[in-house]
C-alpha cells in the first residue's frame, strides 16, 4: 500500500519515486549481482534442504546460474539493500572501525559454534574501484589484527580473506569485482567496510520516503550515479550544520535517522549513492563530489 499511488483490479500504479528506484535497481544489477549472491549463499550455507530445492545440488558453487528460479532469488536478495531497514543497520556498522567489525564477526561465529543464537552477516567493502559484497565464514586472530575468511562469488572455489589491522585498516589483497579482471589490492579504513545483518533482510519493509497515509511527513531520498566507472560521493549539510558523507576521507553521520549507502553493483559502472534523510530534515544542501 505504501508504494502504490493507486490500486485498480489488483494492479499497482507505483509512485514516481518507486519507479525511480526500480530503474536504479535494474541499472545496478546490470553491473553485477554480488550483493544478491553474498546474501543467498549465506542463506543456503549448511541448509541442504533449501539448497537441494533449487537444483538438487550439494554446494552453492554447483548451482547453474541460468535457472530462472535461482536468478529471481538472487535478484530479490540483491534489491533488499534498497530497503530502509537494511540501510539503517548497514549504516550503523559503516561508522565502526574495521577492527570492531572483525570482533563482531568473531563473537558471532563463536556463538554459532556453541549452538547459541547468532546473527549472520554479509560484508560490503568499498574503494575507488567500486564496491563488492562477500560472505564471511571464519575469523582468526593474528599478530597485529584479524583475518576474515570470505566466500567471494567471483572466485567460488578459492579461499579468500580480508586482513584487518589493530589500527583499524583493512586490505583485500586478492580483490577484483570482476573475475575476468586482474586482481589487485583493495584497502581502507572507517567508512569503507560495513556489515549487514541477515535479520534486517527478512522484512516486512517500509517506505519512509513515500507519501504516508497517516498524513505524517515523509522523509527525503537523494541519489546520485555516474555514467562511467568513477565513484561519486554526496556531502549533505542541514540548515543546523549537521553533516552526512565523507569529509577529509572519513565517513561522518551527524544526522539522527539518516542513512548513506553505496548500492553495490560492479566494476563497469560506479556504485550509485543512496541517501535517506528523516522527515525532521526539511532544509539541506547536497554537493556531489568525485
Regions picked out by a protein language model, each given a short descriptive name:
Residues 40-131, 141-142, 153-155:
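Conserved active-site-adjacent core of cysteine acyl-enzyme catalytic domains
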